[in-house]
Amino acid sequence: MISEQQLDRRTLYMSTRTNESKKEPKKETPAFPDEIEHLDDIRNKLEDAIKKADDSVERIDKEYMDSKRYMVQYRGEIDPHEMFQNELALKQINNRGVFAVQNRDKLFKMLDSPYFARIDFLEVSQRTPDSFYIGRFAFSYEDELLIFDWRSPIAGLFYDCKIGPAGYDAPAGRITGELTRKRQFKIKNCYMEYALESSVNIQDDILQRELSNTSDEKMKSIIATIQQEQNRIIRNEMSEILIIQGVAGSGKTSVALHRIAYLIYRFKDRLSAKNVAILSPNKVFGDYISNVLPELGEEQIYEMSFEDIAREQLEGIIHIEAGKNSLEVNDPEWEERVSFKSTFTFLKMMDEYLSKITETVFEPSDYTFGGFIAESNWIQNRFEAYYNYPVKQRLQRIADDIYDRFENCNFMDEPLPKPRNILKSLTAMLKVKNALALYKDFYKHMNIADKFVMPAKSTLEWADVYPFIYFCSAFNGLQENQEIRHLIIDEMQDYTPVQYAVINALFKCQKTILGDYGQIVNTNHLHTLNDLRELYKGAEFIELNRSYRSTYEIITFAKSIQNVVSLQPVERHGDTPSIIYCRNEQEQIATIMKEIIAFQNSKNVTLGIILKTNSAAKALYDVLSQSFEVHLITTESTSFKSGISITSIQMSKGLEFDEVIIPSVNNETFFSKYDSSLLYIACTRAMHRLVLTYTGGLSKLINT
């Protein structure tokens, strides 16, 4: 039931705690004496709760093993009914054990950092204010709630309100009063590193400290520094479709994941992690964000890509050509096809064609069996009546209708046709026999035959995959995913209107859609944010314009390359980005190596070397891997690691690094308006330090 690894966790953790306690706690900022005393009290109560939780785990484990041993020992003597009851009891014991282990693990996590804030709130009906401590999880001791979950209604006061009149929405209704105190803490290893009195939402000093930390191989929770505009998104319960347009570094992905944690907490009776999925651009990004929800006490959600969905829908139907990188393909006709199919106009053309599918695909004739007849015009009317159904499902329903009609008229008890034979006859009346034939006819009918090319027999170009699935939906129907009740779509700017149309057919659920239309990496995608808003006319639309990732100097530099007017940097200062001229390629490699050595001697944890294309990244990796331990991030990669990573701009989207090096920033590599967008993306991956190297002439996109 409970693994040895889980049972050993307490020993390992307490050993770590003992070692940490030998270290002197940081004395960065003198804490309030009352807060030191309170933290000591909470620590003692947590350690006592852990001991009790540990005892509970061991007791349940013993109970489970005793019951299991009894069932094995007396298996031959126990009647089936008693065996069933014993197995049921064993399952219940196991469930209690799982819950006990989860509770103990939660307490272990709390012991490191029990809470991060305190608020004092005086309700209108009270004479003295109550103090509330806010943490990652709630904690009760002897029936007294000592720490409140960051998602609880009362915690909204910390994120949204300043000192003074305030209120929050509780299950019982609106609670009003006065917020009299706000304190923020940094607690590590259950020691107070600092405590600050605050009158505003999130003390800038704490935000600066947290943003100045080094990056890691996993995205972290941001519960201690959630900003007011982010909190409004996280606690949004009503929006069926929520679109978040967020600039680079605005925390949009983290906010979306925190929103899921909040919704699971708020609607735990009907929503769990099993009912949530995220559509992410690649496996590396999925791995990078995989720690956020577990860190918040929730299970990891299901992660998938558009490629995964396509292969699942088209398995055994047709093959899919490997996707091409628009930056590395020189094929004007292919580029024209891809661009055309990325537009909202293309989706409208498909809808126009499919609206006339009745006359396109079906030419009924009379159906007779013995003395029974279903006239062609009656069949046609039934086909039109089922316009909301795919073609194949229409035929199935008509076959059932014909059988029912014949049966109702069968006064002489004559033999009737089998429904499957009726369906076979109806299928023969189709002018178009399958979805692929229908898709080909669309191009012919709309006089755009040159826009459809099959690279090989029974193989589709990637740009045709989702349009074809859309036609499959109209002809065969798609299997809707009923289990997913909330879908997150990240990097929304990378997906075409047709892809969204298919997703809407597959996932008829609540959606959080996020991205940045200033970070499009596919040169052939012509769709816009307005197109997306047209697709989701009733959606709530929110913009996040403040960037928290990069220093003021890095953001200012990035804005000089691509002037994103709405982008607002945080006042966190650092070094000005370095632009280094190299006389030749050998000197550029030597310069990059020198920067790597400087990184290795620094306190920074992650370095990203970002090139324009995947092939350029691979070429540099082949050189640098002979001298350094480096990781190459490609489309086949599945994880993000700390240390030195080499990748393309396309693969770096959504990731962040302490330091970034961008090689070959010359006129030959970066010269077009589109290249300015790529450079902007690469620059905004850097948190603390940015270096650009070049040979020949410096790109004119950079204003020095």
Regions inferred by a protein language model and the residue ranges of each:
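Extended, charged low-complexity regulatory segments
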Residues: 1-223, 227, 231-235, 699
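Pre-Walker A (Motif I) flank of P-loop NTPase domains
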Residues: 238-242
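Hydrophobic anchor at the beta1->P-loop junction of P-loop NTPases
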Residues: 244-246
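Walker A (P-loop) phosphate-binding loop of P-loop NTPases
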Residues: 249
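Conserved lysine of the Walker
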Residues: 252-253
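Post-Walker A alpha-helix
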Residues: 256-257
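Alpha-helical nucleic-acid-binding subdomain
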Residues: 264-487, 494-502, 510
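Conserved helicase motor core of SF1/SF2 NTP-dependent helicases
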Residues: 269-270, 274, 283-291, 295-299, ...
